[in-house]
């Protein structure tokens, strides 16, 4: 089941989302846009289970990482509009 994982440029490179992910979807990659010189990346979105632990772990007020659940998941959860 494919979910979309978006990482925004408000990421501070803290690695909290990477550590929170139970399926190792995320990893840190070099990036000059923040003090930590790294940003989260989601190279393995096919393994995402949609638990949103990465979102919960994000310490920024902007939720620098967002998981958008696939259509099949939202339908089975009764979230389809």
From Swiss-Prot:
One cellular-component annotation, GO: photosystem I
Name the UniProt record assigns to this protein: Photosystem I iron-sulfur center
Function recorded in the entry: Apoprotein for the two 4Fe-4S centers FA and FB of photosystem I (PSI); essential for photochemical activity. FB is the terminal electron acceptor of PSI, donating electrons to ferredoxin. The C-terminus interacts with PsaA/B/D and helps assemble the protein into the PSI complex. Required for binding of PsaD and PsaE to PSI. PSI is a cytochrome c6-ferredoxin oxidoreductase, converting photonic excitation into a charge separation, which transfers an electron from the donor P700 chlorophyll pair to the spectroscopically characterized acceptors A0, A1, FX, FA and FB in turn.
Entry-linked SUPFAM superfamilies: 4Fe-4S ferredoxins
Organism lineage: Eukaryota, Glaucocystophyceae, Cyanophoraceae, Cyanophora
Encoding gene, per UniProt annotation: psaC
Binding site for [4Fe-4S] cluster 2: 21, 48, 51, 54
UniProt organism field: Cyanophora paradoxa
Top-level enzyme category: oxidoreductase
Cofactor: [4Fe-4S] cluster
UniProt cross-references to Gene3D superfamilies, sorted A to Z: 3.30.70.20
MF terms (GO), sorted A to Z: 4 iron, 4 sulfur cluster binding; electron transfer activity; metal ion binding; oxidoreductase activity
GO biological process: photosynthetic electron transport in photosystem I
PROSITE patterns hit by this protein: 4FE4S_FER_1 (PS00198), 4FE4S_FER_2 (PS51379)
Top-rank lineage group of the source organism: Eukaryota
EC number: 1.97.1.12
Subunit structure: The eukaryotic PSI reaction center is composed of at least 11 subunits.
